[in-house]
């Protein structure tokens, strides 16, 4: 008896219908039925066939007459034509996509509402918990997951940046434990200057692994994640990096189509729109592009504006399976009225805004002051996999940036009167026209070897870079505060501290550049080798050494020229022991060096720069660091918790003694770094840390400096971002940030000035309306806390005021 849905062959066996056979189910992928995704489909089809056959055999006999079905007539099949090269590439691309889809599905243990990871998800993050990032971008130099890496690395995914409402890199300095904001030369309040673990890192910012020496204002609309490497990193990154380095990972083109638009409105006339679109053009080529528009004032500050626009474009081309070529280009343009902050009330040892002056008081001039920061950079990279053991990569970068401003410094205040309404200050001009041009090339050969049960990932690399900076100023509109005060033409004395009376005065001077810029050029040729040896995922040894040939020149249009060279050799070594698969204990040691003149944005020696007319050339500062730590992946490996003890020492540190620059100082920083990122439960996610430090000047040409702590850093800091998922698509969250006092000075904390400690609280509530639309209400600085970003190094400094309370409504559309 023949059953419906089955037929007999010549031997009377029951067979599955053709539509349920594995071969038919696989034809939409390719004609050969290969790959893990195909295997899964085959298994499913096979189970369906077995179920169908079993069901058929279990049916009771029917009394209906049998139906005879003639077997189809066999016909000769035409010979398959040989596929073209384009068809082969398309087939390979589909096979890769199927494998990637299968891997993504397997990785999502707790997907949102049972779905898969978002199409625009961070490729480096835990698919089930985007607060937890598993790997950093530099996969060759850091081949192991963060759990197995003997170094403290803080990684903020774009989801963390969004929930912190971090739209500019500077906000990371306000809300990250162990990182402090600083002010630059001449009170440059606009460049991103960071201190990591107590050391200046303003020239240790990288974009996709290539140094970005612009010291400009950096937006985050093109950012996938931000990586903070803590501790010396010269063997990875080259010169500097005494306290660590920051790497900005840009958004790259992918294989999944998506569209996302974020629209934001807020207090202080905030209007912001960002766009992010990824489109697969063909199986081998995809494009990702995005844009930014922002028009805004600054919360709690009068007249200050923060307008931005930008765009990025990224492409990925895989002409064959083993070759990937990527490009990206980013443009950002920021403008507005600059803000140099408020004067310092020396008698009360606080900024004037903590002594009764309104926090929004601005001392600039609307008819003169302006600020522009513009940056363009493009990167082309190729990755070729020779075989399973050898991969070659090469990157090329070109960059041009501009930082152009005239601002007003509120300096030399007269605050002796007991009545704050009678206090006065001098509003002095500060200006800069700075351009930065960079050409760089990185080449890596990565080798994966298995020697007697030990798996090696070794990297041999070279790097060549050319950096050129030109720094000019506007005629009569420059003032270096340290010392005798301002003599600039644009200075106005007798400005009332409580109510500046000259904000709208006209200026008869038309700003013009001096035309005699200070120019710096740095050529660096580097070679490095690194190896990570993993024995049964129990013992992991990591080490590397790097040589940098550093060649620096400084000149002006006047007959002033300086040239110097330095040969830098630095190394690192780390050992990891894993008592359990989810935990590691490690010890690490590393060195780094700061060559003379390596802070290219500075024209003064107190900031690490070298004037073209200097007669003194000093050797590199030498840094050594030891770290002992442990890391654990908890909650089904969706929560990474780490703790580390560290000590970093600097020798040959530069300082000015009796007006003469010397290199006889030394200091030490010790501390503990505790961090947690990921989920505590399926609904509750956290990201944050606690850093406690002690610093001490151990050598100095100024006897009174010995034993003092270091200036410009917060020795205790804490931050914690928390988010909880409710039912019906609701989420609530917030952030708490603490920073201890910051003491003023150039090197040692010897001025007696200080900024008070503070707590800052943020909060947000988010509602997913449907699968495409989400709305978020965000409150930043919820209690409207008056706190300060940084203070200048002089005896009577000015102080940068942090933003006040602000509310934002953010609408996100995803398609």
Predicted feature residues:
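Structural signature of Gram-negative outer-membrane beta-barrels, strongest in the C-terminal barrel
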Residues: 316-320, 436, 455-467, 518-650, ...
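Gram-negative outer-membrane beta-barrel transporters
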Residues: 642-649, 662-747, 783, 812
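Acidic/polar loop-and-plug regions of large Gram-negative outer-membrane beta-barrel proteins
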Residues: 294-299, 311-318, 322-385, 400-436, ...
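Outer-membrane beta-barrel translocator/receptor signature
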Residues: 222-224, 235-311, 319-323, 376, ...
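C-terminal beta-signal and adjacent terminal beta-strands/loops
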Residues: 738-747, 766-815
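Acidic, small-polar-rich N-terminal luminal/periplasmic segments of exported/outer-membrane proteins
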Residues: 72-256, 628
């Amino acid at each position: 008896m023949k059953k419906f849905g089955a037929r007999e062959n010549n031997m009377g066996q029951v067979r599955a219908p053709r539509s349920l056979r594995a071969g038919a189910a696989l034809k939409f992928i390719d004609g050969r039925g290969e790959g893990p995704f195909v295997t899964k489909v085959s298994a499913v089809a096979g189970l369906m066939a077995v179920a169908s056959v079993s069901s058929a055999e279990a049916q009771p006999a029917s009394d209906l007459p049998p139906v005879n079905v003639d077997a189809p007539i066999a016909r000769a099949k035409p010979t398959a034509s040989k596929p073209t090269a384009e068809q082969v590439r398309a087939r390979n691309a589909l096979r890769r996509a199927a494998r990637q889809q299968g891997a993504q599905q397997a990785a999502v243990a707790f997907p949102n509402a049972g779905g898969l990871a978002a199409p625009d998800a961070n490729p480096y993050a835990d698919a089930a918990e985007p607060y937890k990032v598993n790997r950093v971008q530099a996969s060759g130099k850091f081949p192991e997951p963060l759990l197995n890496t003997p170094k403290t690395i803080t990684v903020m995914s774009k989801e963390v940046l969004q929930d912190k409402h971090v739209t500019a890199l500077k906000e990371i300095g306000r809300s990250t434990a162990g990182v402090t904001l600083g002010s630059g030369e001449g009170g440059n309040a606009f460049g991103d200057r960071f201190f990591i673990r107590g050391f200046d890192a303003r020239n240790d910012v990288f974009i996709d692994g290539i140094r970005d020496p612009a010291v400009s204002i950096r937006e985050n609309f093109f950012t996938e994640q931000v990586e903070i490497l803590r501790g010396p990193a010269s063997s990875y990154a080259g010169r500097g990096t005494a306290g660590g380095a920051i790497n900005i990972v840009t958004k790259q083109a992918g294989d999944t189509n998506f569209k996302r638009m974020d629209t934001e409105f807020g207090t202080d006339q905030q209007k912001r729109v960002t766009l992010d679109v990824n489109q697969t053009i063909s199986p081998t080529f995809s494009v990702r592009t995005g844009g930014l528009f922002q028009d805004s004032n600054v919360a709690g500050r009068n007249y200050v504006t923060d307008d931005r626009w930008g765009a990025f474009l990224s492409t990925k081309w895989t002409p064959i399976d083993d070759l990937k070529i990527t490009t990206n280009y980013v443009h950002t343009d920021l403008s507005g009225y600059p803000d140099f902050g408020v004067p310092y009330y020396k008698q009360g040892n606080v900024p004037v805004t903590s002594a009764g002056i309104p926090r929004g008081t601005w001392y600039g001039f609307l008819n003169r002051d302006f600020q522009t920061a513009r940056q363009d950079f493009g990167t082309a990279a190729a990755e070729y996999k020779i075989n399973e053991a050898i991969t070659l990569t090469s990157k090329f970068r070109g960059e041009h940036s501009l930082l152009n401003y005239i601002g007003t410094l509120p300096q030399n205040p007269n605050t002796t009167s007991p009545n704050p309404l009678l206090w006065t200050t001098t509003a002095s001009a500060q200006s800069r026209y700075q351009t930065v041009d960079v050409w760089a090339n990185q080449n890596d050969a990565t080798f994966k070897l298995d020697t007697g049960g030990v798996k090696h990932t070794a990297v041999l690399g070279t790097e060549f870079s050319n950096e050129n900076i030109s720094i000019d100023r506007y005629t009569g509109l420059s003032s270096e505060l340290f010392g005798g005060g301002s003599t600039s033409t644009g200075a106005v004395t007798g400005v009332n501290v409580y109510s500046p009376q000259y904000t709208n005065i006209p200026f008869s001077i038309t700003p013009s550049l001096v035309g005699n810029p200070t120019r710096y050029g740095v050529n660096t040729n580097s070679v490095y080798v690194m190896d990570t040896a993993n024995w049964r995922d129990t013992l992991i040894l990591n080490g590397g050494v790097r040589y940098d040939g550093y060649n620096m020149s400084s000149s002006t249009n006047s007959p002033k020229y300086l040239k110097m060279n330095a040969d830098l050799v630095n190394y690192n070594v780390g050992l990891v022991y894993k008592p359990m698969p989810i935990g590691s204990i490690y010890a690490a040691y590393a060195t780094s060096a700061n060559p003379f003149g390596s802070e290219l944005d500075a024209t003064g020696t107190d900031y690490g720069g070298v004037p073209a007319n200097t007669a003194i050339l000093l050797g590199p500062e030498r840094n050594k660091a030891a770290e002992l730590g442990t890391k654990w992946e908890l909650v089904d490996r969706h929560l990474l918790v780490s703790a580390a003890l560290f000590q970093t020492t600097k020798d040959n540190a530069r300082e000015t003694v009796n007006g003469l620059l010397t290199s006889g100082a030394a200091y030490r920083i010790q501390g503990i770094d505790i961090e947690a990122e990921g989920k505590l439960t399926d609904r509750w996610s956290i990201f944050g840390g606690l850093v406690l430090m002690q610093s001490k000047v151990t050598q100095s040409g100024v006897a009174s400096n010995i034993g003092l702590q270091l200036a410009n850093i917060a020795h205790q800091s804490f931050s914690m971002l928390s988010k909880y998922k409710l039912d019906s698509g609701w989420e609530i969250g917030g952030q708490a940030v603490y920073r201890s006092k910051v003491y003023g000075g150039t090197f040692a904390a010897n001025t007696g000035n200080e900024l008070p400690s503070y707590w800052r609280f943020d909060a947000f509530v988010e509602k997913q309306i449907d699968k495409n639309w989400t709305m978020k209400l965000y409150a930043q600085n919820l209690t409207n806390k008056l706190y300060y970003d940084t203070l200048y190094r002089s005896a009577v400094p000015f102080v940068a005021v942090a933003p006040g309370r602000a509310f934002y409504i953010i609408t996100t559309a995803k398609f």
